[in-house]
Amino acid sequence: MDSNTITSFQVDCYLWHIRKLLSMRDMCDAPFDDRLRRDQKALKGRGSTLGLDLRVATMEGKKIVEDILKSETDENLKIAIASSPAPRYITDMSIEEISREWYMLMPRQKITGGLMVKMDQAIMDKRIILKANFSVLFDQLEALVSLRAFTDDGAMVAEISPIPSMPGHSTEDVKNAIGILIGGLEWNDNSIRASENIQRFAWGIRDENGGPPLPPKQKRYMARGIESEV
């Protein structure tokens, strides 16, 4: 196993521990807690894949970070902060919406590009809106936290979420996953519209009508993939 992979995991575990302490002391906001829950799942998945104990990895990560801080100067820290762009956090969904439990009568799911697409294909003839929470860097979607589909009456009918045990995903992965989701839901005569944030930061366009910015041919093509249930 590559030593850099182990070191990276150990440091990530310790930094997550520090962030958890902040959360326990009520020193952070809702997006911070949201990322904390997401990263906890990712670390558990990575730990299982690497065969490493999280507690031991956290202690080793602490030693690594402390050694680095001993040799770090304030001037170096200022330069590092100034040269690193900070991602923004976009929230279409409330805490209640992103943490809500939901059930499917006719479940379908597909894995694509490190993302899990789930939908209830029992849903028919509904008006559905797609909402997402994600980070943005350089005015483009950087990392998806969660995308969920809701009917007009608030029922949740579909979801796209990162798979913790798999490596990260790209903007194109998110686009493809949304295409699969839209195609699968439209197959049952549902009317889909994406939030303005999804359209702006995933596709870089604005649609005044809130319609999904995918050509019909692309949606039909990707909808075929939903037939292969995982």
Curated annotation (Swiss-Prot):
Record region (PABPN1-binding): 223-230
Cell location: Host nucleus; Host cytoplasm
Keywords, in A-Z order: Eukaryotic host gene expression shutoff by virus, Host cytoplasm, Host gene expression shutoff by virus, Host mRNA suppression by virus, Host nucleus, Host-virus interaction, Inhibition of host innate immune response by virus, Inhibition of host interferon signaling pathway by virus, Inhibition of host PKR by virus, Inhibition of host pre-mRNA processing by virus, Inhibition of host RIG-I by virus, Inhibition of host RLR pathway by virus, Interferon antiviral system evasion, RNA-binding, Ubl conjugation, Viral immunoevasion
Region annotation RNA-binding and homodimerization: where it falls in the sequence: 1-73
Region of interest (CPSF4-binding), residue spans: 180-215
Domain comment (free text): The dsRNA-binding region is required for suppression of RNA silencing.
Protein name: Non-structural protein 1
